[in-house]
UniProtKB/Swiss-Prot annotation:
Family named by the database record: Belongs to the class I-like SAM-binding methyltransferase superfamily. RsmB/NOP family.
Species name: Shewanella piezotolerans (strain WP3 / JCM 13877)
EC identifiers of the protein: 2.1.1.178
Organismal lineage: Bacteria, Pseudomonadati, Pseudomonadota, Gammaproteobacteria, Alteromonadales
EC class: transferase
Any one GO CC term of the record: cytoplasm
Full protein name: Ribosomal RNA small subunit methyltransferase F
Gene of this entry: rsmF
Keywords on record: Cytoplasm, Methyltransferase, RNA-binding, rRNA processing, S-adenosyl-L-methionine, Transferase
CDD domains listed in its UniProt record: AdoMet_MTases
């Protein structure tokens, strides 16, 4: 049962639109959320995913604002995070409302465009991986996370979902306006907030709500939206979102930006973003999603266009030195391209982004070179392979992100054995094939060494699971 702080109730009454009632808000906020997932179209189409999961007792109800998002019901209770399909990155467990900001950020017309996109507060990665899918793994996506512990989680999800066009940073996002002034075509600021809209997931979210705490959060939000706007190119678009419900964390923060840059800020009306969007649309054109409108978490989404350039206040910082990578030589590029093609049938999307560091070969997003020296990056693109005395050894994250036509397809039971870190015994002995990719549902799971009578497991130890969720046979 949700716990409502009376101070919060008194405050939120003032912000609740006149056509909505407090009783419905409390009623819906006390209900559990409908489980929802987003299909990862970097690996599988929604059509094929539904075809794969329907025989396993999944039922799908489309989420109107995300073309690959679904509310789901299962015939039997299964731990979704431990299913084969989740572990191999076919879907992301994501609350329906949180799929709104990326949808608002990148319209269908912008899908696959070669552009620079910034996600200022990325972890754990639901919106980042959704943006990457909307970009079709093209262009450059900079994903920033301030919390050191959450950067690791962010990278794990990016790797699992097969994201290849991403560069990770670890900064207080207030620095982007200074270090990346007018660089990005699109910016998402899913701002830290009081989390009022998450009460359906966390019944204690409002137990200790205090308006004095909110005032401090608002100051941070204003500084962040200012930084986001400075990092945006003229003509670029910014989406500001929170899972808060009050005007002071939402409309007022957007109004602050408009007052600060009156000639450069234009609010974009989102009333036609999806069928029914008008039900949550404010007079400014923002989406203020209350739990009772779509039976979801509470959320706020605003889209802002930068109609003209602004004056740079701080001088351009000095160029960062000691970039630890160097462009691969033509010889090294030819060798790694040949290795991947001959061994696995993998054809790289581009050879322009191949860099080396010590005995490592990396594939950077093709347009990343323009950002070298602007700031320090935690991780760029993906590691393709380690250089051995003779040849290379492919990395797991590369196998997950790059399509291979030459795989050994595993059964349900074999895929579970593989994800638990065990070797797979073959029914009959054949000629050893060496390094080979194994797949499930036509999507890569990882690398094995084919020894003729068994497949030796090469799954990274930190990805090995003690238990894989199983569906009981009906």
């Amino acid at each position: 049962m949700a716990h409502f702080n009376q101070n919060f109730i008194n405050s939120i009454k003032q912000d609740l639109p006149s056509h909505l009632c407090m009783e419905d808000f409390i009623s819906y906020s006390s209900k559990p959320l409908r489980p929802s997932i987003r299909v990862n179209t970097l690996k599988i189409s929604s059509k094929n995913f539904i075809k794969l999961m329907t025989p396993k007792g999944w039922h799908f109800d489309p989420i109107p604002w995300c073309e690959n998002g679904y509310w789901i019901k299962l015939d039997q209770e299964v731990q979704l995070g431990n299913t084969i399909e989740h572990l191999q990155g076919l879907f992301y467990i994501q609350e329906a409302s949180s799929m709104l900001p990326p949808t608002a950020l990148l319209s269908v017309e912008q899908h696959d465009a070669q552009q620079y996109v910034l996600d200022m507060a990325s972890a754990p990665g639901s919106k980042t991986t959704q943006i990457a899918a909307l970009m079709g793994n093209k262009g450059l996506l900079v994903a920033n996370e301030y919390s050191a512990s959450r950067v690791k989680v962010l990278h794990a999800n990016i790797a699992r979902m097969g994201v290849a066009n991403c560069a990770l940073t670890h900064f207080d996002a207030r620095v982007f306006g200074e270090y990346m002034f007018e660089i990005f075509d699109s910016v998402l600021l899913d701002a830290p907030c009081s989390g009022e809209g998450t009460i359906r997931k966390d019944p204690d979210a409002l137990k200790n709500w205090d308006n004095n705490d909110v005032k401090g959060i608002v100051d941070t939000q204003k500084a962040l939206i200012d930084s986001a706007f400075q990092s945006l190119k003229a003509g670029g678009e910014l989406v500001y979102s929170t899972c808060a419900l009050s005007r002071q964390e939402n409309q007022n923060v957007c109004d602050y930006l408009k007052q600060r840059y009156p000639d450069a800020v234009e609010f974009i009306n989102l009333s036609s973003l999806f069928p029914g969007a008008d039900k949550s649309c404010t007079e400014e054109g923002f989406l203020h999603v209350w739990p009772q409108i779509y039976d979801s978490e509470g959320f706020f989404v605003a889209k802002i266009k930068k109609v003209s350039s602004i004056e740079r206040v701080l001088p351009e910082p000095k160029k960062q030195k000691n970039f630890p990578f160097e462009k691969a030589s033509a010889k090294k590029i030819a060798e790694i391209v040949e290795y991947l093609k001959t061994s696995f049938g993998i054809v790289l999307p581009s050879e322009n982004g191949i860099y080396v560091r010590d005995a490592e070969v990396w594939l950077f997003p093709e347009d990343f070179h323009k950002l070298i020296g602007k700031m320090r990056f935690q991780r760029i693109g993906m590691k393709l392979a380690d250089v051995l005395k003779k040849g290379f050894k492919v990395k797991h994250e590369a196998v997950l992100a790059l399509t291979s036509p030459n795989t050994i397809e595993l059964t349900d039971d074999e895929a579970q054995v593989f994800l638990m870190g065990r070797d797979i015994t073959l029914s009959e002995k054949v000629k050893p094939q060496g390094e080979t990719i194994v797949s499930y549902a036509g999507v890569s799971l990882g690398v094995v060494k084919h020894l003729g009578n068994k497949l030796k497991n090469n799954l990274p130890r930190d990805l090995v699971k003690d238990k894989i969720a199983r569906y009981e046979q009906s």
